[in-house]
Swiss-Prot record:
PROSITE patterns: ZF_CHHC_U11_48K (PS51800). It holds the Pfam family zf-U11-48K. GO terms for biological process: tRNA methylation. Zn(2+) binds at residues 18, 24, 34, 38. Belongs to the methyltransferase TRM13 family. It comes from the Eukaryota. This is tRNA:m(4)X modification enzyme TRM13. It catalyses: cytidine(4) in tRNA(Pro) + S-adenosyl-L-methionine = 2'-O-methylcytidine(4) in tRNA(Pro) + S-adenosyl-L-homocysteine + H(+); cytidine(4) in tRNA(Gly)(GCC) + S-adenosyl-L-methionine = 2'-O-methylcytidine(4) in tRNA(Gly)(GCC) + S-adenosyl-L-homocysteine + H(+); adenosine(4) in tRNA(His) + S-adenosyl-L-methionine = 2'-O-methyladenosine(4) in tRNA(His) + S-adenosyl-L-homocysteine + H(+). GO terms for cellular component: cytosol; nucleolus; nucleus. The gene is trm13. It is an enzyme of class 2 (transferase). Its EC number is 2.1.1.225. tRNA methylase which 2'-O-methylates cytidine(4) in tRNA(Pro) and tRNA(Gly)(GCC), and adenosine(4) in tRNA(His). It is found in: Cytoplasm; Nucleus, Nucleolus. It comes from Schizosaccharomyces pombe (strain 972 / ATCC 24843) (Fission yeast).
């Protein structure tokens, strides 16, 4: 008996975002089938390092989750906030330019592919070397927002010791470097490292588990990240408070993705001291950070565009304001590290020609 082919309506054939992960879509008529098999579907976590929202100090504030945008502000209100952000940023020390290098990246740079990533990694490794990341007979390394863990691969090239790598990322990543870290070590007769990959949101990461697991190893602990997006940086600082590492090196980016709910009590108090006292006011600050990395529209001159923008500012002026807003958030994080007992600094670790997101947070424990 011949099968009857079902005819779907246009609505049933429409592609819709997956409710579990908006990064991919599904045909509407297959939604129920997809939800049962989607890799992003919620699962009951039994990992010993999982504790829901352990690194978030409070629940979501309704005023932050609203659809408020800075376009809702009048020109006068916008001008008031721009004046405040200018005043705050101008009162803060600016980062120093410290573009470093590590020879472990020579071969990678000669490959010629994605060279900008290699330049960033080379400088971050140079900063790690200055903080004695590689001086030990084995260390414990946390890579936050690890992605494919390419940076950890080159940390192993620098250290060449029996290290432990704890690779933390909430997403599944293809072409991971985990196996390459092991293969490189075997090929070069280095001690074989241990690699632990944790697929987890940093907000739920109970770092105490690993601290207790390796407490008797005698190995120093270090943290780093090449691309820690927005709120993930604040969550990482919250996470590290329970078991502070010897040092941390974090390349900062995507400030427009910061969220009030992921800030610590100290960070909120510091912002309030500067005149940014609630989620909506912080939303104005973080949305303006996007101005720093907005590209020029076609046929627009850097000194133009003021008449077509809500702020009445040219593209060039908006970029300057955006950079100042980013600096306020970065400096708040620097102060947070100092509150945790670290010596800390902000540095331009690469030039703007490599990436517009070129500031790194450096922190290391004070020696009494």
């Amino acid at each position: 008996m011949a099968r009857i082919k079902k005819i779907f309506t246009q609505e049933e054939l429409k592609q819709i975002p997956c409710p579990y992960d908006h990064k991919h879509t599904i045909v509407r008529h297959r939604l129920e089938y997809h939800l049962k098999r989607c890799n992003a579907r919620p699962v009951e976590r039994t990992d010993p390092y999982y504790k829901k929202d352990i690194n978030i100090s409070t629940s979501t504030d309704a005023s932050e989750s609203s659809s408020f945008e800075i376009v809702d502000l009048s020109k006068e209100e916008l001008s008031k906030w721009i004046c405040l952000f200018n005043r705050i940023s101008d009162s803060l020390p600016t980062p120093q330019k410290k573009v470093l290098f590590h020879p472990a990246m020579n071969a990678r740079l000669e490959e010629g592919t994605k060279k900008k990533h290699a330049i960033q990694q080379a400088s971050l490794l140079g900063h790690m070397e200055k903080l004695h990341y590689f001086d030990n007979q084995g260390s414990i390394y946390y890579e936050f927002g690890a992605g494919r863990a390419e940076l950890s691969r080159y940390v192993q090239h620098c250290s060449q010791q029996e290290n432990v790598y704890i690779l933390i990322d909430r997403d599944s990543n293809r072409t991971k470097h985990d196996s390459r870290i092991l293969k490189d070590s075997i090929k070069n007769n280095w001690p074989e490292p241990k690699i632990i990959r944790c697929k987890i949101d940093i907000k739920d990461l109970k770092l105490d588990f690993f601290a207790s697991e390796f407490r008797n190893s005698g190995k120093p602990v270090f943290a780093y990240s090449k691309h820690l997006c927005g709120a993930a940086t604040d969550l990482t600082l919250n996470c590290l408070k329970s078991s502070p590492p010897n040092a941390l090196v974090i390349a900062l980016c995507c400030h427009h993705h910061c969220r009030w709910r992921t800030l610590s009590t100290f960070a909120r108090e510091q912002l309030s001291h500067w005149g940014i006292s609630n989620p909506q006011e912080f939303q104005i600050l973080r949305q303006m950070t996007g101005w720093a990395v907005n590209s020029l529209r076609e046929h627009m001159h850097a000194s133009g565009g003021a008449d077509s923008h809500i702020s009445g500012l040219s593209h060039e002026e908006r970029v300057k304001i955006g950079l100042k807003c980013k600096h306020i958030i970065n400096y708040m994080r620097k102060l947070e590290c100092e509150k945790m007992g670290y010596e800390s600094s902000l540095v331009y670790y690469v030039g703007e020609e490599t990436t517009l997101e070129n500031v790194a947070l450096i922190a290391y424990k004070r020696i009494n």
